[in-house]
Each structure stands twice: as structure tokens, then as C-alpha cells.
Amino acid sequence: MPSKAKVAIVGSGNISTDLLYKLLRSEWLEPRWMVGIDPESDGLARAAKLGLETTHEGVDWLLAQPDKPDLVFEATSAYVHRDAAPKYAEAGIRAIDLTPAAVGPAVIPPANLREHLDAPNVNMITCGGQATIPIVYAVSRIVEVPYAEIVASVASVSAGPGTRANIDEFTKTTARGVQTIGGAARGKAIIILNPADPPMIMRDTIFCAIPTDADREAIAASIHDVVKEVQTYVPGYRLLNEPQFDEPSINSGGQALVTTFVEVEGAGDYLPPYAGNLDIMTAAATKVGEEIAKETLVVGGAR
């Protein structure tokens, strides 16, 4: 049987459980452990039924095991990951961080994954970042983008207490990613918790300022190419319509604009399909883990 990277999931909540189902389908990753702190959590119960070794005794239990993971996916909280990250590093365990801790470099698969395959710890930014930064990157690789603004609208019921408590952190982290990874000179991020019932799937609007003489066909083609790339790991990611180009106006600060509308429908592995905002995080994290495993196993001669 082909070799797979041994994986531990730290956290046993909604995101961790959805991630588990994606990892179970992977040709490169083998989930072996799920670590939580709540012995009654549904995530631990499901993981145990699926054959994983589970514990509610936290990260220290995992690190005390004689057989250790190659990779850890952590979906706890920023402060928990900041405490655990040095322990993973000391044990030689690579970490994929789904919290806002940002201990390691931020990764958006279509934009900069190849640059960070050797990093001991990588951060998945935010759901809004995973959904919108690829579009900013698609535009900025064709023309200069002096300003980009993203608006992420997610179903209110999909936003848990952690998201609600960290709205400011969400916007700052996403805006920073729009600049550092997306390539915009300045960036802004807005999140809307949509209270509609039945819940609406995630929808995002991405505004990019562009030169008035920009090659619009090249920009549109680049956007379509990046959307196709994201769809390889998030099939429910799609354009709502063609990118819209607007001439400079007072409303746009005198700059030409390209506006892109996308929506993200989840795969429904554990979370409902409307929770595309959470699904894109687990799918992107799985993609990153698989690419790290491919690099490690192929270069190391395990395959």
C-alpha cells in the first residue's frame, strides 16, 4: 500500500470534524488521531467510530505518544495554537494552523503554496481570505492593483462564538492578506453575518482598482484560470457572473474598477452546504497538507 503522511487533528469541533471527512478521502494523508478537551464532543465520538485514536487530554497527550504524527492540523483557538506551536516544532511535527494565530507564513494555495512547502508551520488566514484573495492575486499578476476591497457575506448561523469574538481580527488579517499575498498596494476587508433564514451560502464581492488602459481580456482570463484552480479543491467555488469592468468615476475615487462576484457552496461532508465559508477553510487546509505530504514523501523516497 502506498505510504501516507500520518496526521493528527487537534480540536474536535465543527471545523475539525468536517476536516476529518476530507482527510479520510485523501490519497496522501492518513488521519490517525483526533485530540480534544471535551470528552462528550461529537467530533471525538465520530472519529473513534471511524477508527481514529482519540483523547480529550489535549496536545500534551499526543506529544507523549511513542508514535507521532508527521502533520498536525489545528483548529482550536489562536492562544491554544500559539502555546502548542513551539511544542510541535521541538517534536519535528509540521503544523497547518486553521486559527488566527499566524505563527507561520499565511498560505493561499493558488498564490503562494509552492513558496512555503518547507515551512514548519503555515497559517490558513481566514475563510474570507481563502475565498477572495485568489481573485485579487489573479488581477495583480496582470496589472498593478493600487487598492482592493473584499466583502464576505456568510450565513449568521455558520459563525460560531469564536468568529463573532474575532471580527476585528478577521478583517485585519484578511486585509493584510489582500496586500501581502493578493498583491494590492492597499487592502480592506468587510464581513457580513447574514441572518437570512433559510441560510444563504457564502457570497463574496471583490473590488480591484486597475489602470484605465488595463488589458481587460487578460484580467478576465486570469480570474477564470484562478477560479478553475480553486475548484480543484473546492468544487462549490464559482463565479456568479463575468467580471464587471467600470470606468473611473467619483464613486470609485477616480479609478477604473474590476468587480468579481463569487459564491462558495460547501461539500456537505459534516457542515451544511450553506457553510461554504467553513468548508473552504477545511478544503484549502487539506490541499496544503497534501502538497506538503507529496513533497515530503516523494523527495524522501517513500513513494
From Swiss-Prot:
EC number: 1.2.1.87, 1.2.1.10
GO molecular function (one): acetaldehyde dehydrogenase (acetylating) activity
Catalytic site: 127 (acyl-thioester intermediate)
SMART domains membership: Semialdhyde_dh
Catalyses which reaction(s): propanal + NAD(+) + CoA = propanoyl-CoA + NADH + H(+); acetaldehyde + NAD(+) + CoA = acetyl-CoA + NADH + H(+)
GO biological process, one term: catabolic process
Keyword ATP-binding: no
Control of this protein's activity: Unlike HsaF, HsaG is active both in the presence and absence of its partner enzyme.
Family statement: Belongs to the acetaldehyde dehydrogenase family.
NCBIfam families in UniProt: ac_ald_DH_ac, PRK08300.1
Function: Involved in cholesterol degradation. Catalyzes the conversion of propanal to propanoyl-CoA, using NAD(+) and coenzyme A. Has a broad substrate specificity, and can also use acetaldehyde, butyrlaldehyde, isobutyrlaldehyde and pentaldehyde as substrates.
Protein name: Propanal dehydrogenase (CoA-propanoylating)
Organism annotation: Mycobacterium tuberculosis (strain ATCC 25618 / H37Rv)
